[in-house]
């Protein structure tokens, strides 16, 4: 699979709004996220591994970390909030595997600042909320990932800044706005460059992201906001519930005790 340094040399996804354009970044991010889930599995099995097995797994994890994640440590993402918190959750998983509290602290501080920059005061998300006919889907996905990150950061002992928390509350309210009034939701204009905005109605996803199958749970836990009734979302999310975990954050929020 393509590594981080190689993917930076490739064209952006949906170049020129072409939905058929090759998306090299997806190949990289999917491989990165599979690797993150590999570490999560290794963490669960760590106490069951023999000394030789642990040595092999640890060597592989360190090798893959250098390829997919080490180059992104403290990297400033200019647009959007996507899978595994732009890789931040994967870095926290690695920090857990290596028991590197310093790395975890640096990552959380960096990611909170990034989230504060990418989440606007009114709750809209840079890039995510302005994806044309997929805006609702990507906004709710971005919020799901942000809430998942905040929940995990809390387990590390981090306190979410009040300003960021307020933005997440508003972002939750924007999820509900998109459900209740699509036109009002999309009336918010975006002043930046949007290379991945999709206008084709054939590609429309005018519903809450069904991949975020426990968004209602995370919203209630982290922000206290109740998710509005979205019939399409409730029907479609059943497919991803069978996956067992939310693949964008690496765990199942419905299993939170």
Regions found by a protein language model. Give the residues of each.
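Glycan-recognition and catalytic cores of secretory/periplasmic carbohydrate-active enzymes
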Residues: 74-82, 101, 178-185, 252-255
